Amino acid sequence: MSDYHSFDLFYYGLAFDNCAIMYVNLLFILLSLLPLWYNKHPKFQKIVFWVYFIPNIIAYATNFIDMAYYPFSKSRLTTASFAVIEHEKNIAKLIVPFLGDYWYLFLWFFFLIGLWIFLYKRVKVQPAPITSKKIYYSSSVLCFLGFGTLIMMAIRGGGFTSDTRPINMLDASRHVNISAQADAILNTPFCLIRS
């Protein structure tokens, strides 16, 4: 990365990070923003909890897998990578050494997931009385439309200019001098979703 400033790579990577976060959390955001009078009910919040954590843990796990995968492949994990793994004949023999070599990644992953769930549960959603349904629904619709616009901007790479469409993996190469540096801009969940 010496030929290009690391800060610039991280800056351009934010567009791809935001896009992946929006894709992974779209259902959670939708359930949280819909103007439903029962969305603060404990049973509904339990559903929202699982809708949030199941896709996020899967996406988070792909990043940890890529920490071990990238040094060997020199590319981000994509759906094509799974096609290669699918045809691997000695995968069972490789799993035990993999677990032994990368035990610290598993430990770190489960520690961070536990911390994430602990912190999530510390935020208590309290039912608030709805004094005026008209104000509640109109403010909810405005929030929904406002956040919907921001989500679309994130998925499109940060704006609504005429050349901006939903970004893809090739867009990362527009921001680098050396094509190998595009991997520093990309993230694994984004690559899996867009490949």
Where are these regions (language model features)?
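Transmembrane and membrane-interface helices of multi-pass
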Residues: 1-194
